[in-house]
Every structure is written in structure tokens, then in C-alpha cells.
Amino acid sequence: DGTLACTLPPGDWTVLRVGYRALDRQNGTGTRLGKGLECDKLSKEALRIHWANYVEKTVKALGPGLAGPNGPLRTVLNDSYEVGTQNWTHGFERTFAEHAGYAITPWLPALCGRVVGSVAETERFYRDFRLAVTDAFAANYAGEMRRLAHACGLQLAIEPYGEIPSDDLLYGEHADIPTAEFWAKLDSPHWVRQAASIAHAKGRRLVAAESFTTNAQEGRWQNTPWSMKAKCDWVYSEGLNRIIYHRFAHQPWTSPARLPGMTMGPFGVHFDRTQTWWKQAKPWLKYQQRCQFLLQEGAFVCDVAWYCPAGYLYINWGHNPHKMPVPVPTGFSYDFVSDTTLAEMRVENGELVLPSGQRYRTLVLPEQAFELLPASRAGVARLKAAGAEILTFEEAKGVLAARAPDVAWNDRAAKLNWIHRRDAGADWYFVASPRETPCRVDVSFRVAGRVPELWNPETGEVTKGVPY
């Protein structure tokens, strides 16, 4: 009946009543009859109910041949996470005990902002609590969704960033197609390197992105292939190799009176047959086709694996990766690697090698102020004992700057970016400039004993005998 009956020792006591409830967040894009509370992201059972009443119904309605690897419906995409965080679910006390090795009940006052034991002990509990939520979200939401998708013959794509109560890399590693996002505005932030790092580490061929997103000020039918090209080249050089236009809308109307048709409000480049330059878009599409084909081939050549433990990326960059300090000097490539990727690494001829075949020359650790967990310290020690080069965040730039870069150019004001891939004895570099105007520089590549060729993705022309 809500009455507490107990005998307490002498002294002053505060009685805390601790409970949990559903988040007051509803799906933002549902139809009038499709609105409701967001699914519990820490519960496999809740996700199965949601899946059975949404995706599975769609797959069954389409029937054999229309949903699956050869049908028009091939992929389920988890968009950027924008529905608020979550830190509890039914039975989470058992999940926490399995993860942390101790009961959560004595520590519940800490979740109400109180110190339990000492400040240091309470901080350690917070760390264990966050890690338990992190792993539960990645496994019970993304991991279970991937299992359900595969059971329906579908692939899972994930945009692993936003308000997620998890680690971006751990969450995204469950994707068959790691997916990013970039906006049409040239200097806007993007998350391509994060998705590309996951793909390289886990052996995923495709790195996709929600591409050329806009708001009302940047959209409004103002974008053209010319205005989009510089940003497109830049994200290609960050690791992207599949464009997903935001947005391409079905336009069922033929009457001019119904133009411009379905627009998805103010968001996104209007990429469909109602565009004024639609009939002239073939060269733009052929350009992207040629770029993406080559960027999907071969293996990524990378100097540095930058170890980012759970929570590190979000703590350092929040929602803007451009603000993150990078320990790698210009001319050297790098990937972000997670806790699970670190555990999978082995050393071969002094290089760090992953089961996917991805190789790195150097492992760079987080700043010394970022405390590593015992398992992480043991993993780093194992690799160092096997002969890997491991540098601290603070020393990495100085050590690497004394070496030959993979790419160098004679005009630092040019601010170029590039990506290097290799296959069957051939090396190819895609070089990008952030400018919308021509840029002339002399570029050097860390390749010897080869004769260069220039491949033009605008025309498909290959020029041999390039001066070098």
C-alpha cells in the first residue's frame, strides 16, 4: 500500500524511493496512426516486438523476391540517434551485476546525485554504470537488430552518432554498412572518418553517408553539382564510397501544377526529376560512379590507429568532430579504433594487423589524462611486448613529423586531403581540395619504383606518361 515499515539504527536517515519510467519521447516521423513511444533500446524483447510489428510486416507484405539481397528492399537504416538518452530497463540490475561484478542496489543513491562511500568510489561506480549502459545499448539494440535483419535477408546500416547512450564506435561496429552524414554546406561538420574507421576495422566494403543534407537557408533549390563537388570530394578523401542522397523523393505527379512536388520540407538537396538541372545531371552521376567504384576497391593504406576507448570520441568532440584535437601531423592517415578493435589486434613484422586484413604502422593512445581500464592497459602492453610501435598522444606528432609522410605538397595554404588505397601491386590516391576554385600544387607520394598515371573521373580518361 506504499507504506514503508522498517527498524533503523539510531541517527538521521533519508529515505529514497527509486524507480524508473518510460522516456516521454515519441517517433518523430510516423503517420497519425503510427505515433507512439520510442522503443526501449536496452531491451532485446522490446526491440523484437517493435521489429515484428513494423519491419517484419513490411517484409512479409512484399513477399519473396522483393525483400532481400536481390530485391528493391535490401537494407534497414538506423538514422542518426535523436531521441534522447536512456539509462535503465527492466532487469538492468542483473545486467549491471554481470558487467561490473557487483550489485547496484547499494549504489542507487549515487544515481540521485549523492556520494556513496567516497568521491573516488562514486566516480568509479559512475564509470562502471556508463559502461554497462554502453555495452547493453550496443548489444541489445544494434546487435539484436542486425540479427533480426539478417533473419529477414536484409542488411543493417547504422549512423552511429547523436544522443546515443553508448559509444559511437562500439554501436557502429554492428552495422553491415557503417554510415555517416554530411551536409551540403562546405564547412559543415561530418562523421565520415568515424564510419570509415569502423568499415576498415571490421572488413566492411561500403562506407555510406546521408549526403548533402541542408536546412531551409542552405537548401531552397539552390544547390547544383558545381556547389556540391568540393564537399563531395572532401568526404571521398575521408573514406566515403557510397552516396545516399538526402533526399531523393518519389514524384508521382505529372501535372506542372503539382510542382515542385514532394519536398520533405526544408531538409535536403532536392535530387529528383523535378530539379531544373535533372536532365543535365548525367556527367555528375558518372563522376560519382567512377569515384565510388575505385574507392570501393582494394584496401585502405593507413599509418596510424588512434585508440579511442568507450566514451572518448563523444567527450572530445561532442557533436562537432572538427573541434577534436588530432595527434597526427599533416601527410599521415589515421583511423579511430575501439576497445574491441584493440583486443583483436596482433603484431606482424612490426605492424598492427586486424582479422579484416587492415594494417597500421603505429598505435596512438589517448591523452594521458584519460584513464585506461585494466583490460585496455593489458591490451596495450600485449601489443608493445610483441613489437608494436605505441606512442602517447602527446609525443605522436613530434615522432611522426620526423618521418616521410604518405602525401606532401609544396603549398600548405592549399589544405589538401587524400585517401590511399592499394590492391594487386597497384597504389591509387584520391586527392581533394576544399576550394571551389582551381588549385595548382606539386604533390609527392610515398611510392617508389612505379610510373604514375592520371585517371580523370570526370571523363574516364587515363593519362600515361605524367611528368614526375
What are these model-predicted stretches?
Residues D1-P72:
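Mature N-terminal, pre-catalytic/accessory segment of carbohydrate-active enzymes
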Residues K57-T75, D79-Y468:
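Carbohydrate-binding surfaces of carbohydrate-active enzymes
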